[in-house]
Structures are given as C-alpha cells and as structure tokens.
Amino acid sequence: MQKILNDPEPFVDEMLDGILAAHPDQLQRPSPRAIVRADAPVDGKVGIATGGGSGHLPVFMGYVGRGLIDGAAIGNVFASPSSDDMLDVTRAINGGKGVLYLYGNYGGDRLNFDLAAELAADEGIEVRTILGADDVASAPPDRASTRRGIAGIFFLYKVAGAAAAAGASLDEVVAVTQRAAAGTRTMGVALSPCTIPAAGRPTFELPIGQMEIGMGIHGEPGVRRGPLETADQIADELTSTILADLPYGRGDEVGVLVNGLGATPKEELYILYRAVAGILDGEGLRVHRVWVGEYATSLEMAGASLTLIRLDDELRSLLDAPAETPFFVQA
C-alpha cells in the first residue's frame, strides 16, 4: 500500500482537519464528524443533510455549500456515520423550515439516519427522507427500490439544493427531488480496485486486462466481468443499459454526468463521453448540459460511471442554478 498518510487509524479525522484548515471561510465543524456550511443555519430555508462513509470525495461533504447541501455526517472509510453524527448535522442546519435527508440507499445509513430523524422529531425538527437509488446494475426494475445510490446523487443534491436556496417549502423540495430521482439512472465500470487504508489490501481482485461492468463503489459485485473493451464498446453498454431501464422518447432532454472513480484521467472520461454523445444523438435525445470529472469516487479505483437524468423545465432550471462549495463551483 502506497498512500500519503500517517497512521491509518486517524485517516478520516486528519482528512477533515485538512479540509477545515483549507476552507474555514466555507465550512464549520459543529462536532468531530459533522461538517456544515460556515453560515449554517440559514434562517427560513429548508436544510439539506446527507452523509455516508468516507472515501468518495467529493461525495459527501464536498457538496456542502451554497446552492447544494447544508451539512454532511462523515463515517469511516466505506462505513456509515452514527445517528449522533447525523443528529448533530440536523441541529446545526435547521433554519426553521424542516430538513431533508438525502443520501444513498445503503442499509447502515438507513438504520442510523432513520434513528436520527426520530430523535430530531422529538426535538421539534421535521425531517423527510429521499434515497438515491440510481445504480441500474444493483437490482432489476421490479426491485428498483433496493438499488444502490451512486454518482446520480449529484443531480439530486443539485436539484434539492437549488430549490431550497430559492425558498421552496419542504414539501416542494421533496416533490421536485423525488421527480429528479425517478428520472435518474447510473451504470459504471471498474478497471482496478482500491485499498482501504486501515485494511492495507485491495477491496477486490481484478486482473490487468479485465474490467467489471456494474461494480459498486465499495467493490460490490457487478453484472459481468470480462476482457477490457474499447471506450466505444463500454459507452455503448453503459448507455444502452440505462436507456433500456428508463425508456426515453425522441426529443427528450437529458443531463449527462461522466464520472471518474478516482484513478481515471479526464482525457479518458472525455473519450468515453465522445461515444456517449454520438449514441444519444442517434437516439434523438437532446443533451442540455454535461458534467465530466470526479463527482463520486472510490479512493483510487480506476473506472467510470455514466449517469443520465431526464429533464423538464423546472429540473433544467434547478440544474443550471449557481452553486459553490470547496469542491464544486457552477456560476
């Protein structure tokens, strides 16, 4: 294991120390594993809270800021934060209009955050929950509610955060974010594993020259493993799988996210998008906006994911709204 670290045990806390030291004007830390906006709570605004295990920057805390989310509970690498962490975030961002919990569909997170929501309710804070469940490889359509949440949660953060910043009520933020979630799908490919610092060994084995389609961001098994294919072939499989899962009509408008998993250069991501763009054009779909880069990673895993979101006028406007965090800026 070759990593820039001290003792693996305080890896997450030292990372948080560094982020807060670099961005004290944008972030504050009400408790050791809670990160919120520097100006939180924002009075009269719906608070947006998220959380999950470390190792996925900029997910989760990287989207804490203006026009996105208000706070994040931080767990150990690939491990759920505690209910106390999420309750600390909830208290710190409560501006009096309620709080939306928006996070990926994983068992540990659901258990701990449901408890946090109950404890917040006991304190008079209304909490609603939406789960990101965009990974089409993780379950068939008839079990879509059990799917994992991966890079598509970026679009949900963007929609919910923009709606809340515009003054929407909790019911309105929930409604538009649910609509965004219903039209968001992701499919990924892994080319190499990552290593959790405390474990000191790769999370899975994938020989050189092999790829795994549909692997999860924690190393969960995908749908197939085989020889590494060309960028065009990978793009075709990812795109066709997404379009088959949620059929789009000719003339529909979409947003596109090509996401690197941590060790894949942007050059390769753009080669992938080159092929995706041609496929979408051939299907008669109009691309409104494209995001290419690292939006939801898995430490140093090599690979990429493709996310499509089906747009309407309101979703388009919310995706285009300005946002600013230490990890993401959109004018």
Model-derived features: positions:
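Short glycine-rich or small-residue beta-strand-to-loop segments that form or flank ligand, phosphate
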Residues: 2, 46-53, 69-72, 98-107, ...
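Short alpha-helices
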Residues: 131-172, 176-183
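Short, acidic/small-residue loops that bind anionic groups at enzyme active sites
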Residues: 72-77, 121-146, 282-287
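Glycine-rich oxoanion-binding loops at beta->alpha junctions
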Residues: 56, 65, 69-96, 243
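N-terminal amphipathic/basic leader segments beginning at the initiator methionine
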Residues: 1-48, 313-331
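C-terminal non-catalytic interaction/assembly regions of soluble proteins
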Residues: 241-331
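Short Gly/Thr/Asp-enriched flexible loops that form oxyanion-binding sites at enzyme active sites
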Residues: 110-124, 143, 268-274
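Mixed-charge interfacial surface used for oligomerization/domain docking
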Residues: 166-271
